[in-house]
Amino acid sequence: MDIQESMIRSTIQGFSTSYLLYTACELGIFEALFDERKHVTLLAQELSLDEEMLFRFMRPLVALNYMEEENNYFKLLPLGEKLSGQANDSLKDFLLFTGRQAMPYWSKLCEAMKTKKIPYQLVEQQSYFQAQVQQNEKFEVFNNMMSKTSEGLQLEAYFAEKKDWYCIKKIIDVGGGSGEIIAKFLEFYRNAQGVVIDLQHVQQKAEEKLELYGINSRCTFQVGDFFQEIPKSGDLYILSRILHDWEDEAAITILSNIAQSMGRSSALTIIEKLLPEVIEGNASHLYMTDLNIWTMCGGKERTQSQFEALFHQSGLTIKALYPLKEDDYLIEVVKKDFEYQEGIL
């Protein structure tokens, strides 16, 4: 078999590797091996699995360097440790989200392309976000993944360039989920009060997190919908990983609602990934993420010029652009009639 054929075959079978890792996560294998190596017999007993089948299941995990095996004893390697919930930089929640809520709908991609329908809605009777409201299990999986991703967002370099920490008095995080992002902003803007705006089903998780972060005296949760009127009087608004969930018309509605609530000296910080303006070979992961978002909820990742078009139609304009880690960007946006106020931006 030549190299090209081998690469193609490996890609074709990529789905099986994803299901292998997801199944190992669901079975609790990574947790069971996190602290110590174990014999396959003991591991099978602890997990209530057939020993022979478990050994066969573990072999590709060894070959893929997620663990090592010696004399039927298995031990996690660094790649496997990252898929355990005990790891500080764990990808477990992302893997569970992918396995439970993303992978099943990719099988509908061909039909969706032909019918111009969202793959998720070819299977389910409601939209993805309607399911979040009505099905607590789906919300838990999605919220855990988003919380872990937001906690890992590194904003230190951005804050290091800001000189306005004493001027910002009120921060409004629109669609702020459990509050992980606004917690980072309130740590820097020490004189500010915060408000997280999100739907009713998010409230309990958000209030628990705000208390955990020790900012519940400075930050409150307010039930709201970014497709409706947004509270006014914010010096700084946050919109983190929201726009990519929506097609252009809906995204313009969200931005326009925020723009209407902004004062002439207010600013909006948007956190999103940016696609290259031209197709680049090293950006395949971004293009696949773009398709994954469409598969789930009909949204899309965008280029900077596509964002600029949305802002133009919403009465907004880019003030500054800050690269963050792993393809994330922080986009500072202001109203077209922005009026400079000392200390803000």
Protein language model annotation of sequence segments:
Residues 2-37, 45-48, 52-169:
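Conserved Class I S-adenosyl-L-methionine-dependent methyltransferase catalytic core
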Residues 1-69, 89, 165-345:
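Alpha-helical subdomain
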